[in-house]
Swiss-Prot record:
SUPFAM superfamilies: beta and beta-prime subunits of DNA dependent RNA-polymerase. Its EC number is 2.7.7.6. It comes from Psilotum nudum (Whisk fern). This is DNA-directed RNA polymerase subunit beta''. InterPro entries: DNA-dir_RpoC2_beta_pp (IPR012756), RNA_pol_beta''_euk (IPR050254), RNA_pol_Rpb1_3_sf (IPR042102), RNA_pol_Rpb1_4 (IPR007083), RNA_pol_Rpb1_5 (IPR007081), Rpb1_funnel_sf (IPR038120). GO terms for cellular component: chloroplast; DNA-directed RNA polymerase complex; mitochondrion. Belongs to the RNA polymerase beta' chain family. RpoC2 subfamily. The gene is rpoC2. The lineage of its organism: Eukaryota, Viridiplantae, Streptophyta, Embryophyta, Tracheophyta. In plastids the minimal PEP RNA polymerase catalytic core is composed of four subunits: alpha, beta, beta', and beta''. When a (nuclear-encoded) sigma factor is associated with the core the holoenzyme is formed, which can initiate transcription. DNA-dependent RNA polymerase catalyzes the transcription of DNA into RNA using the four ribonucleoside triphosphates as substrates. It comes from the Eukaryota.
């Protein structure tokens, strides 16, 4: 007894729940259940006594918070603000921001949870919360963490993680927002309690149904296979691996060096498990129900221990029912929460590598490649193991970073202690899938993008644009106003208006006929609160008139010179291509101006042509297209003249760049007799040979002569002649292009392109002619698709297009030593087809600043959109007695004001005066003539006076009249208040169709509108003279004239401001003497998009993102914008320049996510795995692995056997993956289940195969489910093999595809199953427990099992004869004597005889 006590272990440590379990297990193994029960009673009594003496109670003060919580949360919030800032800058998109935010808060919560346990142990080890939770008595670590740590991230009703974490804990109390977020989980918890019990019960029923017939029938089935257990060095996983090893049986011997430490078929106890883990052997093979020979029973050694008794399982044990209940019963402990993150987070913290001290890091830059992390940050990935060293003055630290890891710092960068320098990749590659996430606009505005897109070919009629390169999407701020159909806006483009202003007015329809009568409407005053205005609409009548107006003028800068020798105007254009955030400069290209003298071009006309000398040839030959793709529609080349357009030749638009080839060769047509031909057919000539008395060949080569009607065609084909050894294959390679390196015949190869042509001589000899080929490339994208104009607009487009001048197979003949161009690059004018624009006028404009002359090509669009409006006559112009405007406005202009402006008269009701506010417009058309008629204020009903006008409208007279009449009745104290409220703006322009002597169109050069007041300064240009409107400002009745400032940016990026002073002759020069130089603006330009934080000036950065819409010496105007990052593969759902409302779909991002990271817990995950849902990765992988293995194995083994080996390999791998995934779900909930229970279930799910059509025999139909052992036996017996593939059946489907129709009918679909069984004539062999219970027989388990009965009879026989069984051979002999000889012992027996006798008393026997 003392010796036994010495062998016992002595425990002297604090024991928690896990340690108590281990102690009880050791006590049962050492003393048995009876002695263990007595010991545990004493332990229970001791526990209650100590608890009473301690008087442990739980108070709110016992909930101790970790001191590190404050700075952890502060650090997470700081990182969150950095993420938000990067998102505003456009550095990361919404998915990357959400992913990083979730991972940051999850890591913060986990670190706080890890700090909680040491905090309790250090501050108060006897804390009641600490003793209760961490001893395992009540409460988990997660629950205590919510009490004293932070609740962390929660999910919404759809299961998506909310990016707003709950920072507080239950001890501190929750805010209102945090409480509402918590209610999501609380509601789901209440539902879980009511539902999960029924779900778990149904799961248990299905599990028991599929394995109810599995019983332990034999001691050893003879299986030599096993499953591997890979040992780990991770101390956190050692206990898990030890528990999984205990109770198993070894499938092979285990050796330590040359010594055997464990034998096959030896069961693994606690000591052996510890020893196997200690020696850290890589692989240990153990027997498993997955590798048993039979699918209908299991042996003792494959099953292992019965964990209840810690000994080998007894024969006749119904281990299938035990397995089903062991898996289903813990389902009540699981949650039903479908807690997923949309794929942005997997629930694991990545392993980081940190450095121990400050220093400079260095590594080989050639071994790393740049990459974008899942958070959108730049990093470098190493393809192999990377050696990294950190140096400072005193120490050097070397570390090896595993391959495929991310390097987060640059080479030779200074790093600080504990800084993360690398992130190690996950060891196992998780399956991924590509998903889409819609990004919605959170503001109204106008859409722009700065990336490369293309129109989706699948959505030709919609606005879907795939992104080809990562870039930004900009939403320029703006508010959309809904205007009713019968209203139009007071304001035009670029107008400024007050928020309280009336925005719309009733529409004056241009195509309506009849009389429109004035109506009075009560409106809110624009400028003074509390006053009302009477709104009166113009009345129109009389005749119909037509008015035309100029549409738009655009400029772009180019160098222009005139070639006097060829009488051509040459434009030197320098295209600028944008690449990411940089501009790529290209050399100047010369384009020959192709416009007529009148400068009028239609849509699609060629503006200029550039001929690249690389595509110019000087010899005759044939054109052959390669990968070049052209438009099927042939366009005629048109050279415009003054009166008409002459058509000659054809041109073919290049749709896709590629290569084409030119085959040199001469062609001559001789109309004389053959006697004049000095060369013979199929002869070889050299260059300079006389062909006829008048023709000399320019090339050398083979001569081909054909008789064509009354003439002869003579071809000179240069090349080399080759005679093949065998002729039969010549037809396959006749008249075709051969690329370099390709074998032609007889292993003949060329290092350049050739054109192979087979020729048969008159003597019936065939030879090959390898003709030389010149390859040309047309690179689509060498020019920008659209030329950048100086003014941003969407109407006019000047496009670069490449044209081929000859079609495929066309012969080109050179005469008189001329040269021919093959490819031309053209500038084409283009605008919308539905636009009223019918033509465009081009002209050349020169601008001189000091001594520098700049040349601009100006394009003015003309339209013929006619407004047919009744000639107007004001029935009532004003409410007051004086018509001050009528004195100054001619009748012709008066009618046009009613058309374009539809001027609105507002009169103040409590005064006897009126004031007029006309909305400014820069597109007003004024049809001027030399004589104008106007109304006199004294005779306003018809007396006419002649006013000779000099083709422009004097606004100064209007201003004076306005001041005189309108302000005469206004008090001085009220004059200042009306400043910037009253203004008359109009534009002096002309009709393009009117033939005025000396009139030329110049256009707008783009000056800065003053924003100091509400006046605009449009201008008109006539007869080489420029006139500007002079605005009228009402301030102390002092009028002044103001010309707008013009701004130019020179080559040194300096801004100059000047006024227009002098005009020079008839040449188109603008000249000024005085230029004032302003501060340098090094980074921004007009129209440029800038991000928040971008540097505007040397000492100033932008605090907002937006677009620069105005530059001034004193300020910048930035239109606010919201930018979004669109990565490659994303989809834009709107056109460029579209107006969006808040909530509209903006872009769709495409990204990868882990398939296994969607649902990480709960019964739904278990059911998804056990039912083999289509979303389950194992269901897809079993078929994918089968195909991959079959392709590889088929290279070494014949096709039929490759199917069988592939099915075996893929099935075994899928079984192991499915066991690990099911076990992972339960372990994530803290539930421990033995692997052998799950393995029994999984074996039944993978026990069948699906027959295929390939080589099918007449035994089974295609698509029929059969057992795998049965298929293997049939293949051994039949001459014609059965082809099959593995399949993963769910537990429900597996229960309905068994050998027992009684079991199937009692489970589901009773009527269908019984009907089909009756039609087929099925036989139920009553192998399972359920079938025997239904018919009232003895269940084949326990004492009803035949093996158990034989074992009991054998024990009785042994006691009677007192025989000792020394080995397995004598034991078998006694079985034979018992069955056959009834007491006579025989030393010879056959196993088949025993099986034959076992079949007699019962109707069936288990088969392998």
């Amino acid at each position: 007894m003392m010796v036994d006590q010495i062998k016992l272990l002595f425990y002297n440590k604090m024991m928690d729940r896990t340690a108590i379990k281990q102690l009880i297990s050791r006590l049962i193994a050492q003393f048995g259940i009876t002695y263990t029960t007595n010991i545990l009673d004493q332990l229970k009594t001791l526990g209650f006594k100590q608890a009473t003496n301690a008087s442990v109670s739980l108070g709110i003060d016992d909930l101790l918070e970790a001191p590190s919580k404050a700075w952890l949360i502060q650090d997470a919030e700081r990182q969150g603000s950095i993420f938000e800032q990067h998102h505003r800058f456009g550095s990361v998109h919404a998915v990357e921001k959400l992913r990083q935010l979730i991972e940051t808060w999850y890591a913060t919560s986990e670190y706080l949870k890890r700090e909680m346990i040491p905090n309790f142990r250090i501050i108060d080890p006897l804390n009641p919360v600490h003793m209760m939770s961490f001893s395992g008595a009540r409460g988990s670590t997660s629950q205590v963490h919510q009490l004293v740590g932070m609740r962390g991230l929660m999910s919404d009703p759809q299961g998506q993680i909310i990016d707003l974490p709950i920072r507080s804990n239950l001890r501190e109390g929750l805010s209102l927002t945090e409480y509402i977020i918590s209610c999501y989980g609380a509601r789901k918890g209440v539902v879980d309690t009511a539902v999960r019990t029924s779900d778990a019960g149904y799961l248990t029923r299905r599990l028991v149904e599929v394995v109810q017939h599995i019983v332990v029938r034999k001691m050893d089935c003879g299986s030599t296979r096993g499953i591997p257990f890979k040992m780990t060095q991770d101390r956190f996983k050692r206990n898990l691996y030890q528990q999984r090893l205990i109770g198993r049986v070894l499938a092979d011997n285990v050796y330590l060096e040359m010594r055997c430490i464990a034998m096959r078929n030896q069961d693994i106890g606690n000591e052996l498990a510890n020893r196997l883990i200690t020696i850290q052997k890589q692989l240990v093979y153990v027997r498993s129900p997955l590798t048993r020979k039979s699918i209908s029973w299991v042996c003792q050694l494959c099953y292992g221990w019965s964990l209840t008794h810690q000994n080998l399982v007894e024969l006749g044990e119904a281990v299938g029912i035990i397995a089903g209940q062991s898996i289903g019963e813990p389902g009540t402990q699981l949650t039903l929460r479908t807690f997923h993150t949309g794929g942005v987070f997997t629930g694991d913290i990545a392993e980081h590598i940190r450095i121990p001290f400050n220093g400079i890091i260095s590594f080989a830059e050639d071994s790393v490649h740049p990459i974008r992390t899942r958070h959108g940050h730049p990093a470098w990935i190493c393809q192999d193991n990377l050696s990294v060293s950190v140096k400072n003055k005193n120490r050097i630290h070397n570390v090896i970073i595993p391959y495929q890891s991310l390097i987060l710092v640059q080479n030779n960068q200074y790093v600080e202690s504990k800084q993360v320098i690398a992130e190690v990749r996950i060891n196992q590659s998780l399956p991924k899938e590509r998903v889409k996430k819609h990004i919605y606009s959170n503001s109204e505005g106008e859409m722009h993008w700065s990336t490369i897109v293309r129109h989706s070919p699948q959505h030709r009629q919609s606005n879907v644009y795939p992104v080809l390169k990562t870039g930004h999407i900009w939403i320029l701020s703006g508010s959309l106003c809904n205007v009713i159909e019968t209203s139009s806006s007071f304001y035009k483009e670029q107008d400024r208006f007050n928020i309280q202003s009336v925005f719309t007015k009733p529409e004056f329809l241009p195509y309506s006929f009849g009389r429109n009568k004035g109506e009075k409407n009560q409106l809110t005053n624009l400028h003074k609160k509390g006053q009302e205005l009477n709104h009166l609409k113009f009345d129109s009548s009389a005749t119909i008139k037509t008015y035309k107006f100029p549409y738009l003028t655009s400029l772009f800068y180019c160098k222009i010179r005139k070639d006097k020798t060829e009488n051509k105007v040459i434009l030197s254009i320098k295209p600028i291509q944008r690449r990411n955030k940089y501009y790529r400069k290209t050399p100047y290209r010369d384009f020959v101006f192709q416009t007529p003298t009148n400068g009028i071009l239609n849509r699609g006309d060629i503006l200029a042509i550039h001929e690249n000398p690389e595509y110019r040839i000087h010899i005759s030959g044939v054109i052959k297209y390669g990968t070049l793709k052209i438009d099927s529609i042939v366009e005629n080349e048109r050279i415009p003249n003054d009166r008409e357009k002459t058509t000659f030749g054809s041109r073919y638009k290049v749709l896709r760049g590629g290569n084409f080839f030119f085959l040199p060769g001469e062609i001559y047509i001789v109309h004389e007799s053959s006697a004049y031909i000095l060369v013979s057919n199929n002869s070889i000539v050299q260059a300079g040979t006389q062909i006829t008395p008048t023709l000399t060949s320019q090339l050398g080569g083979l001569v081909q002569i054909k008789n064509i009607q009354k003439s002869f065609e003579i071809r000179i084909l240069p090349g080399t002649i080759h005679h093949p050894k065998r002729i039969p294959s010549i037809s396959k390679q006749n008249n075709m292009l051969i690329p370099p390196g390709q074998s032609v015949f007889d292993n003949l190869k060329f290092d350049h392109w050739i054109y192979l042509q087979w020729i048969t001589s008159p003597r019936k000899k065939t030879f090959a002619l390898a003709r030389p080929v010149i390859e040309y490339f047309v690179r689509k994208g060498s020019y920008p698709p659209i030329l950048n104009l100086l003014k941003e607009q969407n109407t006019l487009r000047v496009k670069f297009l490449d044209y081929m001048l000859y079609e495929d197979g066309e012969e080109i003949q050179i005469k008189n030593n001329m040269s021919i161009q093959l490819v031309q690059t053209c500038l084409l004018l283009d605008w919308e087809k539905k636009s009223p624009i019918k033509a465009a006028k081009t002209s050349i404009l020169e601008l001189r600043i000091n001594k520098i002359i700049k040349t601009f090509l100006q394009i003015s669009l003309l339209n013929s959109f006619d407004f047919y409006v009744k000639g107007s006559k004001f029935k009532r112009f004003f409410n007051n007695k004086k018509s001050f405007v009528a004195d100054s406005i001619p009748k012709t202009l008066e009618s046009q004001l009613s058309i374009k402006h539809q001027g609105t008269i507002r009169s103040v009701s409590n005064r006897k005066t009126s004031f007029l506010v006309l909305s400014p417009s820069d597109s007003f058309q004024n049809s001027l003539s030399t004589n104008f008629q106007y109304y006199d204020s004294k005779n306003r009903y018809g007396k006419k006076k002649e006013l000779k006008w000099n083709t422009f409208f004097d606004t100064k007279k209007v201003s004076r009249s306005l001041k005189k009449n309108y302000l005469s009745s206004i008090k001085d104290s009220e004059k200042r208040s009306l400043n910037s409220k009253v203004g008359l703006t109009s534009v002096s322009s002309f009709d393009h169709t009117r033939q005025l002597q000396g009139m030329k169109i110049l256009g707008l050069l783009g000056y800065l509108y003053s924003i100091a007041n509400c006046f605009l300064y449009p201008k008109g240009i006539f007869r080489n003279e420029v006139f500007f409107h002079r605005d009228s400002s009402i301030d102390d009745l002092v009028g002044f004239d103001k010309l707008p400032n013009w701004y130019f940016l020179d080559e040194n990026r300096k801004i100059y401001s000047f006024h227009l002073r002098n005009l020079i002759g008839k040449r188109f020069f603008y000249w000024t003497r005085n230029l004032s130089n302003f501060n340098e603006i090094p980074l921004v330009n007009l129209g440029q998009f800038i991000c928040e934080g971008a540097r505007l000036f040397e000492n100033q950065i932008s605090s907002q993102s937006g677009q620069i819409i105005a530059l001034s010496p004193e300020f910048l105007i930035i239109r606010l914008a919201k930018l979004y990052l669109a990565t490659k593969g994303a989809t834009i759902h709107n056109h460029y320049g579209d107006l969006l409302r808040e909530g509209d779909t903006l872009i769709t991002l495409t990204y990868e996510r882990f398939k296994s990271g969607d649902i990480i817990q709960g019964l739904p995950k278990v059911e998804q795995l056990l039912e083999a849902r289509s979303v389950n990765a194992v269901s897809r992988n079993i078929e994918d692995n089968f195909k991959k293995c079959n392709r590889v194995i088929a290279k070494f083994i014949e096709s039929p056997w490759s199917f069988f080996f592939s099915a075996k390999i893929s099935t075994e791998q899928s079984r192991k993956d499915l066991v690990d995934q099911i076990q992972g779900v339960y372990q994530s909930q803290g539930v421990q289940i033995s692997d052998k229970h799950i393995e029994i279930i999984v074996r039944q799910m993978t026990s069948k195969v699906l027959t295929l059509e390939d080589g099918i025999a007449t035994v089974f139909l295609p698509g029929e489910l059969i057992e795998l052992p049965r298929a293997q036996r049939m293949n051994r017996a039949l001459k014609q093999l059965i082809y099959y593939k593995p399949i993963l059946l769910g537990i429900t489907k597996a229960s309905l595809n068994t050998t027992s129709f009684l079991s199937e009918a009692s489970f589901q679909e009773t009527t269908r199953v019984l009907a089909r069984a009756a039609i087929r004539g099925r036989i139920d062999w009553l192998k399972g427990l359920k079938e025997n219970v239904i018919i009232g027989g003895i269940v084949p388990t326990g004492t009803g099992s035949r093996e158990v009965t034989c074992q009991m009879d054998l024990e009785k026989h042994k006691k009677g004869s007192n025989l000792k069984i020394k080995n397995t051979h004598s034991f078998s002999c006694e079985i034979k004597d018992l069955l056959f000889n009834h007491g006579k012992v025989s030393l010879t027996f056959k196993r088949s005889n025993i099986h034959r006798e076992l079949k007699k008393p019962l109707s069936e026997n288990d088969s392998d």
